[in-house]
Amino acid sequence: MFFKPDFRPRCAKWLIATGLFLMLGACVEKPTTLERVKEDGVLRVITRNSPATYFQDRNGETGFEYELVKRFADDLGVELKIETADNLDDLFDQMNKPGGPVLGAAGLIETPLRKQQARFSHSYLEVTPQVVYRNGQSRPTDPGDLVGKRIVVLKGSAHAEQLAALKAQNPGIQYEESDAVEVVDLLRMVDEGQIDLTLVDSNELAMNQVYFPNVRVAFDLGEARAQRWAVAPGEDNSLLNEINAYLDKVEKNGTLQRLKDRYYGHVDVLGYVGAYTFAQHLQERLPKYEKHFQTSAKKEQVDWRLLAAIGYQESMWQPTVTSKTGVRGLMMLTQNTAQAMGVSNRLDARQSIQGGAKYFAYIKDQLDDSIKEPDRTWLALASYNIGSGHLEDARKLAQNEGLNPDKWLDVKKMLPRLAQKKWYSKTRYGYARGGEPVHFVANIRRYYDILTWVTQPQLEGSQVADGNLHVPGVDKTQPPVPPASPVPSSSSTDESPL
């Protein structure tokens, strides 16, 4: 007879231990979304590829949404990983996939349909939906005028929801949704007459209007609406709460306003005539001087497109011009400045550009070390226009008002005061036409934006120099009256000391 050991007590103990282990495991809390982001060291964000959200230029990633979310990632101490959606429907689909992006940052509007797809943050920007049409066509004035028009909008957009609601009230309104285009494409289609109308947000129209000067606003379709970030509906509140705290913080400390100023504070300085004229001159005048701008800019370590923008603001790229105050040439140098920069003939385009580049680099180098980019560039431009003494007066006024003298957004508020006795009587250098540098900088920033856009990597090469660069919106059959420009000089030398 064999001995049969009894394993039941051991088995019971093993089962009890296993059960306790499983119970304890069940009691361990699952990490929150925010904790997972910090543990992984990566914030995955999905956005759209467009000028108002995110794109890449020769300096890398940029865009309003990108900069705002990059600062958020920096606050969290994690790396930012950007993913781009094929369209808006794809954006929400990707966010709702297991392991997908945890944040959508793409100028999103909270709508009834989207509330089922995501949860939304506090607002950071207000925009107005606008119906746009082509100049020369019949202008719609209300939703009833949309009947019988070919309308195309972005697929899955808040604009598509607006039109669906209008169509429910008026079945005669017909529209198409496209997932093969972006806002820039829609504006081009209107500009070229491929479609009658589209619907875009005011901020995106403002950023792109200059490229399509035939595009006009027909009417606003409803009130201003808030743009927000989105998180997936199935996630906990940890990340959303952190986002809201961050957006509140950048609103209070001025960071958000500075970003708005950087991307939107100068976009409306060109009207139809200005945009039309600049587009023409890009093809007709810039190619003659582009190499000079590039050579001088490289020598002085300045972006050639910024230098070209200064030249356009000063003379509209005309080398033999003279103002009533005696400044001359393509970069409109004074006699004293020209001599200091080694320019013997201000009416020689190459010399003028060299002198202007050298002078701008000198001014920029003289600014306080505490001034960082991009404010350093904007303040240097103001100094280029009004003089370093008056700029310092404006900076001191800003400091006295509790503002930041190193920030262009604050200093530009003070510059117009230099024309008011109440204020200039307290300054070292006295009266100045302080409003001029504000407009000067705004114009140059806009020209620079356009030059940056049309010389992106895919447009590089000889397209500008060869005159083959397509600038949308230029219809030379009926040009508008151009704005006033400096009076061309009849002399090709610089013999008269003005």
UniProtKB/Swiss-Prot annotation:
| Entry EC no(s) | 4.2.2.n1
Q: Where is this region: LT domain?
A: 268-498
Record-linked SUPFAM superfamilies: Lysozyme-like, Periplasmic binding protein-like II
Q: Which N-terminal residues, if any, form the signal peptide?
A: 1-29
Q: Which GO terms describe its molecular function?
A: peptidoglycan lytic transglycosylase activity
The membrane topology noted for this protein in its Swiss-Prot or TrEMBL record is:
Peripheral membrane protein
Location of the protein in the cell? Cell outer membrane
User: Its GO biological process terms?
Assistant: cell wall macromolecule catabolic process; cell wall organization; peptidoglycan catabolic process
Q: Which reaction does it catalyse?
A: Exolytic cleavage of the (1->4)-beta-glycosidic linkage between N-acetylmuramic acid (MurNAc) and N-acetylglucosamine (GlcNAc) residues in peptidoglycan, from either the reducing or the non-reducing ends of the peptidoglycan chains, with concomitant formation of a 1,6-anhydrobond in the MurNAc residue
Q: Which UniProt keywords apply?
A: Cell outer membrane, Cell wall biogenesis/degradation, Lyase, Membrane, Signal
Q: Where is this region: Non-LT domain?
A: 30-267
The coiled-coil segments of this chain are: none
> What is the active site of this protein?
E314
Region (Disordered) residue spans: 464-498
UniProt KW Nucleotide-binding keyword: no
Q: Name one Pfam family in it.
A: SLT
For this record, the Gene Ontology CC terms, alphabetical, are: cell outer membrane
Which top-rank group of organisms is this from? Bacteria
Give the enzyme class.
lyase
Outline what the protein does: Murein-degrading enzyme that degrades murein glycan strands and insoluble, high-molecular weight murein sacculi, with the concomitant formation of a 1,6-anhydromuramoyl product. Lytic transglycosylases (LTs) play an integral role in the metabolism of the peptidoglycan (PG) sacculus. Their lytic action creates space within the PG sacculus to allow for its expansion as well as for the insertion of various structures such as secretion systems and flagella.
Q: Which family does it belong to?
A: In the N-terminal section; belongs to the bacterial solute-binding protein 3 family. In the C-terminal section; belongs to the transglycosylase Slt family.
For domains, the record's comment is:
The N-terminal domain does not have lytic activity and probably modulates enzymatic activity. The C-terminal domain is the catalytic active domain.
Q: Which HAMAP family has this protein been placed in? A: MltF (MF_02016)
Name this protein carries in UniProt: Membrane-bound lytic murein transglycosylase F
The coding gene here is: mltF
